Amino acid sequence: RQEKMIDKFKEIAPVFNVENDYNNYYPSFQQNVTALGQIFGKENVAKEKLSALESKIDQVAKDAKGKTALLVLVNESKISAFGDGSRYGMVYQKFGFKPIDDSIKSSTHGQSVGFEYILEKNPDFLLVVDRTAAITEKANNAQKVLDNDIIKQTKAYKDGHIVYLDAANWYLAFGGLESMEIIAQELDRAVKK
């Protein structure tokens, strides 16, 4: 979205675009944090924060090894699944969860799915981003949408592994150091549950 405005911004001041590459998310995130550390003379702080984050992620990946997951985004009553090659692919690539479906089409808005799909795939963990809660005042929309007899048959539901992620963090603030620390903490709590 900001890409269209970069030239106009350059007329005002120097521009450094910290966009993350969804196909190579974590390395691009590291590059951005390192570059920002250099720009603000905080290279050591950036290095320390990245090192601590890497340790936390390694622990999550160790705990998540062999566990299947499906990350879905709930928008009003619609559900979209995100796979390994998506904007949320780092859940699988970096945090160690095994994608429940390797055939999910990679797209910005995910692949439209229904309750039956979730039951059919039956992941160990159902990771949920509530877009509606992130951009409106409708709290707990995803919980209401997923509170049904079909979802209650899933392994994730029965094992208490439906994880409602920090919607604003995952949908709006996704990509910064603080947001990545929150993501690591959320996923760490989820796998230890």
Report each predicted region and the residues it spans.
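Proline-aspartate-enriched helix->loop->beta-strand connector
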Residues: 1, 14, 122-126
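Short, well-ordered beta-to-alpha junction loops that form the rim of enzyme active sites
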Residues: 1, 72-76, 131
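Structural motif corresponding to alpha-helix initiation and N-cap regions
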Residues: 3, 111-112, 148
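Extracytoplasmic substrate-binding proteins
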Residues: 8-76, 170-193
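Short, flexible loop segments at the rims of nucleotide/cofactor-binding pockets, characterized by
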Residues: 48-50, 102-107, 140-141
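Alpha-helical, coiled-coil/dimerization segments enriched in small aliphatic residues
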Residues: 83-111
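Short helices/loops that flank or line small-molecule/ion binding pockets
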Residues: 113-122
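Structured C-terminal subdomain patch of bacterial secreted/periplasmic proteins
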Residues: 124-193
